[in-house]
Amino acid sequence: MKPRIPLITIALCGLAVTMCTKPQSNHRSISVSIAPLQYITEQIADSDFRINVLVPSGASPETYEPSPAQMQQVAKSQFYIHTGLIDFERNLEQAIRNNMPDVQQINVSEGVELIAGDCGHNHQNNSEKLAHDHEDSTTHGHTHAQGVDPHIWNSPRAVKQIAATIYEALARQYPDSIRYKNNYHRFISRLDSLDSELTALFGPNTRHAFIIYHPALTYLARDYGLQQIALENEGKEPSAEHMRRIIDTARNLNLTKLFYQRQFSKSTVDALARELKIPAVPIDPLAPDVINNTLEISKLIAQP
């Protein structure tokens, strides 16, 4: 994973010039790192804020780097909401702390029961828990550098904690807003309904396993007893040996579910689909609507 600090530094240089020549307004605007966080924030804040999403649609957070224009958007924001678990987020988190003291950062991974994993997030239903002490935010940033699966927005149980963190930050800033509280509780009710639906969908006595190129469904797999088998190996294209193990596992388990994300190369997926004679199905774990998207993906996994 190539370093991104130099480009952020360049962006900050341009930002410094802009901030010296234009009046700044850091109110009624929120910047978020990825689209799912935009959706979650909107469910609570409604239309009170203009929300800027840094990673554009169709791009991969793994390779994204913020532009100078986006850094200017962040500087004008009242809040910057992120998971703190993706490389560019950590670099940007430090840059904001050093150069944009008026921007309030909301790290939504706080309180979430995290799962161990490297930048490739290669898990086969790995549910190893992590001690998640956020009292030292600097240590927290370094701890996550090579050790935590970041895809916390793909399970409603984790999203409940994400929503709570966002709501609490808004409530501290706007303690008289009853609407944020009501919106938050409505959203939690929807997440509880989704949780119940997924629990019934997967059931306690049914085994559900699937192959996926980039293992973005680790939290969903943990929370609902699924087996996720990743093609990616430590964030890289799988070796011939790794592919052979996956083929053997798929045949032994009679697997028929193969998912891929359009943000990643499809050549390996196509080769595996031909070998196993099963279809390769596109999904988008970064789609904004975390409720409907998680339900749609879950229904694909649960199909006989």
Walk through the language-model features, giving the residues of each:
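Extracytoplasmic metal-acquisition and chelation regions
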Residues: 19-304
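Bacterial N-terminal signal peptides
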Residues: 8-16
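Bacterial N-terminal signal peptides that target proteins for export
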Residues: 1-8
